[in-house]
Amino acid sequence: MQKAIIIGASGYTGAELARLLIKHPEFELTGLYVSRQSQDANKCISDIYPQLKHLVDLPLQPLPEQLTQLAQQADLVFLATAHEVSHDLAPIFLQNQCKVFDLSGAFRVNNAAFYRTFYGFEHQHPELLTQAVYGLAEWNAHQIKQTDLVAVAGCYPTVSQLSLKPLIAHNLLDLTQLPVINAVSGVSGAGRKATLTSSFCEVSLNAYGVFNHRHQPEIATHLGTEVIFTPHLGNFKRGILATITAKLKTGVSDEQIRVAYQHAYADKPLVRVYEQGLPSIKAVEFTPYCDIGFVTKNGHIIIIGAEDNLLKGAAAQAVQCANIRYGLTETLGLL
């Protein structure tokens, strides 16, 4: 079995990773780590997340100052850490032949200036930006198999790209009219740290990051076309529902659209394309699926995509990428 560790295990995504990895038949979860300053250091993860009692009763160990020994003892590491932290940790693990699955945005776009503009830090490892493979599992499996650094796609970018890529690949969209993505995420997408915006009495349905959210350039870069993206915070715990509007090329039929989706996802079990009806968050929460449905009228298409932001949008896709990297069935440990 491959020895796996999680750094940043006390957050929502880290806890989901722990739950998935503890029962994985090919990965042995050997350690959970948090920063030395974390208020959760030395606590048992199941004391923080009671749903993990008798499933994952492991301590949240403070990350040691010297990481070489830890990196040498692990075969793969999942970084559920802040972008700047992943930026600093990934090179150490890679230098010690440990495969890195990074759930932050630190290596998703091969452009150092992007990080200065959208993440607020200077990227010091341009060589790793070139080496990193973007972890959109259904579309980049071949490249994922050949890399030791996977930059797992973001939550909004995952559902947005899975919904749009087949139509762009089959040249069905008139991109003179930019696709418009309006997506609503549950409060868990804001992380576990307490803020006024995400507190119980303050949380509401509201747009944020209008025209300046860091996921917009991530989506545009990997789609190969600009988009208009507006994220929203919803007053529910988990899940993302994306409503995507685009213009079809003249004469494009529903059958051509179905064929495009079938061609893309017929052998991809974690994407479910609806024959009728439209996805909902209820259908995907607590699952590793992305569900897609569409309706067309008067030369336009409205696509509805839904996923669990903590699973297909984060932890489950990270494990899916690890499965692919090790030549395993990509759904192993997820279904």
From Swiss-Prot:
Protein's GO biological process: L-arginine biosynthetic process
Compartments, record wording: Cytoplasm
Catalysed reactions listed for this entry: N-acetyl-L-glutamate 5-semialdehyde + phosphate + NADP(+) = N-acetyl-L-glutamyl 5-phosphate + NADPH + H(+)
Keywords from the UniProt entry: Amino-acid biosynthesis, Arginine biosynthesis, Cytoplasm, NADP, Oxidoreductase
Positions annotated as active site in the UniProt record: C155
EC top class named in words: oxidoreductase
InterPro entries per UniProt: AGPR_AS, AGPR_type-1, NAD(P)-bd_dom_sf, NAGSA_dehydrogenase, Semialdehyde_DH_NAD-bd
GO molecular function, a single term: NAD binding
Keyword Amino-acid biosynthesis: yes
Entry GO CC: cytoplasm
The enzyme's E.C. designation: 1.2.1.38
Pathway(s) it belongs to: Amino-acid biosynthesis; L-arginine biosynthesis; N(2)-acetyl-L-ornithine from L-glutamate: step 3/4
Protein's job: Catalyzes the NADPH-dependent reduction of N-acetyl-5-glutamyl phosphate to yield N-acetyl-L-glutamate 5-semialdehyde.
UniProt similarity note: Belongs to the NAGSA dehydrogenase family. Type 1 subfamily.
Full protein name: N-acetyl-gamma-glutamyl-phosphate reductase
Provenance organism: Pasteurella multocida (strain Pm70)
